[in-house]
Amino acid sequence: MFKTHKVEIEWAGRPLTIETGRVARQADGAVVATYGETVVLATVVSAKAPKPDQDFFPLTVNYQEKTYAVGKIPGGYFKRESRPSENETLISRLIDRPIRPLFVDDYKNDTQVIVSVIQHDLENNPDILSMIAASAALTLSGIPFMGPIAGARVGYCNGHYVLNPTLDEMPESKLDLVVAGTENAVLMVESEAHELSEEVMLGAITFGQKGFQPVIDAIIQLAEVAAKEPREFIPEDFSDLEKTMLKMIEKDLRKAYTITDKQQRYDAIDAIKTEILSKFAPEMEVNCELTADKIATVFKRLQAKIVRWNILDTGKRIDGRDLSTVRPIQSEVGILPRTHGSALFTRGETQALVVATLGTSEDEQYVDLLTGVCKETFLLHYNFPPFSVGETGRLSSPGRREIGHGKLAWRAIHPMLPTKEAFPYTIRVVSEITESNGSSSMATVCGTSLALMDAGVPLARPVAGIAMGLIKEGERFVILSDILGDEDHLGDMDFKVAGTKNGITSLQMDIKIDGITEDIMKIALEQAKDGRNHILNEMAKALTDARTELSEFSPRIEMMTIPVEKIREVIGSGGKVIREIVEQTGAKINIEDDGTIKIASPDTKSIETAKSWIHSIVDEPEVGTIYQGTVVKTTEFGAFINFFGSHDGLVHISQLASKRVAKTTDVVKEGDKVWVQLMGFDERGKIRLSMKVVDQQTGKEIPQDDLIKTEKEQNPDEKNKSEKKRHNRKKED
């Protein structure tokens, strides 16, 4: 019934199996891939023809994690998987980016890749396996895909690269780098690093590319026996139309691309496009094969060619800069003084308004992954409203691009954050892109660094980011620093690098062509380092270090630790005690299972009150220490005082005051607040207290000499009796 084909290799110490022909046989391509005991199903289906007037390639990649893969039932009311999580969206992008450039030019058939995680061994991350499975399914499908590609994860532990580290090994790694590419070229890199050098990062890319070669060989081996016949696809020839249009618009288009203002430049280009359409209008009426869409397609190609020729021939860019110059930078902090931290970072025509907010453990985000639920204390949200590029548009929930750009900035900042113990706050950063002309994600990195320091978050070092570009024609190439939007769209590479003065914290690279050599990447990294250091120097004009004091509007959090066995006493029966502390002090209190307590409040006094209250519950009173207490009962022989939480002790009538006391109620009454010193314990372990040794106004201990003097002054009868006794003893002698 099944005609299955399978290849199996040993890869990084674990078996990798790619199988086709058993599952999802009606898809154009379907693969079940297994790595260790993690299993994914990848399918691809492409329409037989493009939709009419389709002017782009509609590729959709959906990555989905099934909870049954780890023996779980989904939460929520409906108990089924719903909209993609942030993690699923990010992995969908991770798969999309290296495969998209490999579809043949002008292929516009609706294409969908679906990758499902159907088993997870909690050891091998399914993202790399999903990329491999998608590549294999495309290679087998007969769709015009110039693959295969493969990917690998690279770690860096103890000065050595590690291929495909397991989930347990990743916390020890200073690098989390994913690289994907073909047999001969790197197409995509994404990473988070702990201030690693350019040499280490480049070495990791090369190490990863070599590491995934056996996988490409395995996919080719499977395709030789299981691939479908290639679909016939002949790209439309626009060469004659291109030559004709180039003669008509080259001069005007070159002139338009010397206009430095983005909106003015776009207006000039739109005018040229409108004019060329009007010139071809008579011909379009008689030639049904010549359409406005074809003219628009050729016009876009000519735009790319002219921009590229200008840069390669003159070394000058669209806005007049040379190849390595960064646009003018303006950094401002504290522009929204009632927020916890804020910054406005402007670089040329790209601008980010970034705001940091500090919260408590109640604000932590719970992230439900296949590997378990974790709590995220650093959130970074990137928003790209349509007005930032002078357009109208629909405002909705964040799209894939916004989620991806936010995560890129998150990776850049995350290694520089203080530990949870050193800074026990939940941090949320929102980056509002208010203007955009390229590199908005890197503006977010710079703005986030400034906003966090303005909020008083003690970053290890400031972080900056820069986007690099590439124009390559044959053997000629140039590397561009701080690329514009047009240079991104019309160039061959988008290479984003973020880091500190000490090294790289995040790197993301997307390459649209083959032939990017190690030397080109090395030049790009070195040029990016110079640009990054320049940006850091410009940022330092606004703020160099984190503010030493938090905003007056920020919550204050203090931590204390109690013995685990005392947690029950602090919480109380049914939470009675902890609720009373919260209600009386106004502080928020969070108790961890290990005995760590976080106390949060905008008011320092309420924090101190809550801390003292908790100390009174878990600590034992010490002899010689002064405490404030409440009189709970009076008797003929003294008063009982409740102090230091639930502790009770007796102040004997002789210890109520320095003078002789006839009745206890002459000095204290029930409900009075008094200061007492713990004198010790009687033979039955009962607490002995004294009021007379403490100044009841200040709560300070009275010096012994002063106490004796006061007693003599306030008890003259007792003094006379003592002198009479001494006189009688002398007479007897």
UniProtKB/Swiss-Prot annotation:
All residue ranges annotated as the S1 motif domain in the record: 624-692
Molecular-function GO terms, alphabetical: 3'-5'-RNA exonuclease activity; magnesium ion binding; polyribonucleotide nucleotidyltransferase activity; RNA binding
Any GO BP: RNA processing
Gene: pnp
A Pfam family it matches: RNase_PH_C
Ranges annotated as biased composition (Basic residues): 722-733
Highest taxon of the lineage: Bacteria
First-listed, main subcellular location of the protein, grouped into a coarse class: cytoplasm
Originating organism: Bartonella bacilliformis (strain ATCC 35685 / KC583 / Herrer 020/F12,63)
Basic and acidic residues compositional bias, start-end: 702-721
Top-level class of the enzyme under EC nomenclature: transferase
Protein name: Polyribonucleotide nucleotidyltransferase
Residues reported in the UniProt entry to bind Mg(2+): D488, D494
GO cellular component: cytosol
Alphabetical UniProt keywords: Cytoplasm, Magnesium, Metal-binding, Nucleotidyltransferase, RNA-binding, Transferase
Cofactor: Mg(2+)
PANTHER family according to UniProt: POLYRIBONUCLEOTIDE NUCLEOTIDYLTRANSFERASE, POLYRIBONUCLEOTIDE NUCLEOTIDYLTRANSFERASE 1, MITOCHONDRIAL
EC number: 2.7.7.8
Family designation: Belongs to the polyribonucleotide nucleotidyltransferase family.
Domain (KH) ranges: 555-614
Reactions catalysed, as given in the entry: RNA(n+1) + phosphate = RNA(n) + a ribonucleoside 5'-diphosphate
Free-text function comment from the UniProt entry: Involved in mRNA degradation. Catalyzes the phosphorolysis of single-stranded polyribonucleotides processively in the 3'- to 5'-direction.
Location within or outside the cell: Cytoplasm
Region (Disordered): 698-733
